[in-house]
Amino acid sequence: MKTTASFKKMKQQKEKIAMMTAYDAPSARLVEDADVDMILVGDSLGMVVLGYDSTIPVTLDDMIHHTKAVKRGAKNTFIVTDMPYLTYHGSFNETLVGAKRLMQEAGADALKLEGNGDIIDTIERLTLAGVPIVAHLGLTPQNVAVEGGYRVQAKDAKSAKQLLADAKAVEAAGAFALVLECVPEQVATQISEELTIPVIGIGAGAGCDGQVLVYHDVIGYGAGHVPSFVKQYVNITKPIEEAMKQYVQEVKAGTFPDKDHAFSLKENVIQELYGGALT
């Protein structure tokens, strides 16, 4: 399994990092079989699999539950788990308890924190405590209400310079990697070039050191909105819908289950029980 040092070496050797989300054991197994470098158990699971409108309702217990499942499905892949909304903005002791549960109880290999200057101290203290941290800048879904919705960040010179400063600050604080979301390609490329830690983009162009996408978006699973930066490699929703409809039709018609999908007694047992053959 790769380590934090492995990812730094990949950047040095200009080898791109492939990261993908997973929220359960079966999807984690498929992602691992595809030789993905890193799995993200994102709090995006709130919208993707739990039916919420945002990541805000996702709890620490939710993240622990899903990280455990992913760990069981992908035992040999580095797993990064999101610390959910407001679990790292109170006292550091509370933050440390949550981090400990995600690492020790759930089995995460690293934790991801969203924010900018307000999380620098937390990153530094968690890193000193032995917790590997991935920082998340640009569009930060946990702060979407403050940021005014899901929109591209750092679109002007002032905000682009601030983003670069924030990126350098999280690196200095000890983060071993950085996720940049919904940032213009030129800005993300500059940040990737100026940082020594890997920069993983999502909607941030090809100049990043790696890419991350949501599993369900990539395979077209579900009816949710697919962001414009996502490349959908297959759409499995329609075949699933067709299979469900066919199942219902066959049950209603009495054609499922047929003899190929049912168990039958041996002839001598039928004779003993019922005194003759059954039709």
Curated annotation (Swiss-Prot):
The protein's required cofactors: Mg(2+)
Binding site for 3-methyl-2-oxobutanoate: 43-44, 82, 112
Gene Ontology cellular-component annotations: cytoplasm
Subcellular location: Cytoplasm
Keywords for the protein's UniProt record, in alphabetical order: Cytoplasm, Magnesium, Metal-binding, Pantothenate biosynthesis, Transferase
Pfam families associated with the record: Pantoate_transf
Keyword Metal-binding included in the entry's annotation: yes
Disulfide bonds: none
Pathway info: Cofactor biosynthesis; (R)-pantothenate biosynthesis; (R)-pantoate from 3-methyl-2-oxobutanoate: step 1/2
Gene Ontology BP annotations: pantothenate biosynthetic process
EC number: 2.1.2.11
Cofactor annotation comment: Binds 1 Mg(2+) ion per subunit.
Tree of life domain: Bacteria
Active site: 181 (proton acceptor)
Primary localization: cytoplasm
GO molecular function: 3-methyl-2-oxobutanoate hydroxymethyltransferase activity; magnesium ion binding
Protein role: Catalyzes the reversible reaction in which hydroxymethyl group from 5,10-methylenetetrahydrofolate is transferred onto alpha-ketoisovalerate to form ketopantoate.
Subunit structure: Homodecamer; pentamer of dimers.
Protein family per UniProt: Belongs to the PanB family.
Name of protein: 3-methyl-2-oxobutanoate hydroxymethyltransferase
Gene of this entry: panB
